[in-house]
Regions:
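Solvent-exposed loop/turn segments connecting transmembrane beta-strands
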Residues: 63-66, 86-93, 197-200, 226-231
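An acidic-aromatic
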Residues: 80-134
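Edge/loop elements at the starts and ends of beta-strands within beta-rich repeat scaffolds
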Residues: 44-52, 64-67, 74-79, 96, ...
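C-terminal low-complexity, charged extensions that often adopt amphipathic alpha-helices
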Residues: 118, 126-154
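N-terminal leader/targeting segments and the immediate start of mature chains
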Residues: 21-67, 257-261
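Sec-dependent bacterial lipoprotein signal peptides
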Residues: 1-21
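One face of beta-strands
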Residues: 52-58, 67-73, 79-85, 94, ...
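Gly/Pro-enriched, hydrophobic low-complexity segments
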Residues: 153-261
Length: 261
């Protein structure tokens, strides 16, 4: 726990050092899909993105901090996240390499690397929000995993203005999930998860879409964990998807202090 607190302290200090929607068109111009076809298309689009590289600004707000930083992220499905946090003039302040099993977090200011096994505490310390590895992969890309809904109909399915609106209830987990999907670009614009007594627990918002590899990819992403008071907003300036020969340039210096977590 002391090491966890130390990593959180370091990341907080690093942040402290760094100080569109598509125009509306009538839905009559588009074929309205049955729910099964819609979910299949959304999930197929999500799976088209095999690799992702983006640069932009990330805004992190929790009960203990409210800061922003310039960042670069490389994602290689199914098992690699590489995040670089940069300061003024593009100076590297910190870098993290996370796979499903292991992580390395390098603090360039202290020339110290923290290595260990991936678990919920490690993920929250590095990315400052309580999400699983798979959910983080999707969060940075601006997608939502719909695999569990491929073979079951939604509890409700309606069209409101230019949005499909679907809800799914999960009695085993006592929650209900709502999705709003843009009719034109078949992209999820809003995601909400409710718990018992209709309490909002988690929500996501996605906007500023551009078609990349025939997939609508958002340049603005917001993820909020209501219960844990954690919020991340991402604004991308540049995105590349499915780039060939993508390179992750991450090597801990030979003289760095290594701390096993």
């Amino acid at each position: 726990m002391r090491k966890l607190g130390f990593i959180v302290f370091i990341l907080s200090n690093i942040f402290l050092l760094i100080t569109g929607c598509v125009p509306s068109q009538p839905t009559e111009d588009y074929e309205l899909l049955p729910s099964e076809r819609l979910i299949n298309k959304l999930e197929a689009n999500r799976r088209k993105i095999k690799s992702f590289e983006g640069t932009g600004t990330i805004f992190v707000k929790t009960a203990s901090m409210d800061n922003s930083a310039t960042f670069r992220i490389i994602l290689q499905k199914p098992d690699t996240i590489n995040l670089t946090v940069m300061g003024p003039f593009g100076i590297e302040l910190a870098q993290a390499l996370v796979t499903k099993d292991k992580f390395t977090f390098y603090d360039a200011l202290q020339n110290t690397a923290y290595v260990g096994n991936v678990n919920s505490n490690a993920m929250q310390s590095i990315f400052r929000i309580n999400l699983s590895f798979e959910d983080l992969l999707d969060a940075f890309i601006g997608s939502v995993n719909l695999t569990s809904n491929l073979y079951r109909p939604p509890d409700t399915y309606v069209v409101e203005d230019d949005k499909y609106v679907l809800t799914y209830s999960d009695s085993a987990r006592s929650n209900t999930t709502l999705y709003r999907v843009d009719v034109r670009q078949l992209a999820i614009t809003d995601y909400e998860m409710y718990g018992t007594e209709n309490q909002l627990m988690l929500k996501g918002s996605y906007s500023g879409f551009e078609l990349l590899e025939t997939v609508a990819v958002p340049y603005k992403i917001g993820i909020e964990n209501i219960l844990d008071e954690q919020k991340i907003n991402i604004e991308y300036r540049k995105i590349n998807v499915n780039k060939k020969n993508i390179v992750i340039d991450f090597k801990v210096p030979d003289d760095a202090t290594i701390i096993k977590w």
